[in-house]
Amino acid sequence: AHFAGSSDPVRVLDVGCGGGFLSNHLSKEGFEVDGLDASADSLAVAAQHDPTGNVRYTRGDALSLPFADESFDVVCAMDFLEHVEAPARVVAEAGRVLRPRGLFFFHTFNRNPLAWLVVIKGVEWFVKNTPKDMHVLRLFIRPAELRGMCEASGLKVVELHGSAPVVGSLAFWKMLATRVVPRDFRFRFAKSTRIAYTGFAERLPSGDSNV
């Protein structure tokens, strides 16, 4: 609905696209998608599973995106910001490549003892062969910190919700039984942001106030 008045295809950048789950899904839905990741192996997997053959996969650095200013309608950073040392630079780059009124979508983890217990220790226990230091608590981001990063980058947070796994679903029980996270594992909105949160921000036109 946000882009309903435009006849041009909505151009989406998926930052830290990994194996392409989101990029490939969005391409199937008719969006014009670019996926960026630092891992050549992940990009190869993503391209192999792209049913449309239309996603443009690029190996690159999220801290210095290889794209022109104001070239995307949407930028996604889903489960990515908590893996980088300088998330503020990633957010700033998202703001740079977004067109005015473009949207920045995010999902990440809060930084507190409960998030450490659930996201780090819980995942290590539930999911076998979890890579060492897959998540590091000091890299987790408090909601107020992410709001500040957005404001400094010309982005206004429009919505921010807590996020929690869908407990009791078939995918949840499959994970418990196999200790492998299935592809259909899902999160839902939650009242609390203590563990994880998701939302989106809008790129303000030049000269607009962020208050």
Enumerate the predicted regions with their spans:
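A short glycine-rich, Lys/Arg-flanked "PGG" loop and its adjoining helix->strand segment in the class I
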Residues: 88-100
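Hydrophobic adenine-recognition pocket in adenosine-nucleotide-binding enzymes
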Residues: 80
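Conserved alpha-helix/loop element of class I SAM-dependent methyltransferases that forms part
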Residues: 1-9
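Conserved class I S-adenosyl-L-methionine
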Residues: 104-128
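Acceptor-substrate binding/catalytic loop of class I
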Residues: 108, 128-145
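A C-terminal cap/extension of S-adenosyl-L-methionine-dependent methyltransferases
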Residues: 126, 148, 152, 157-211
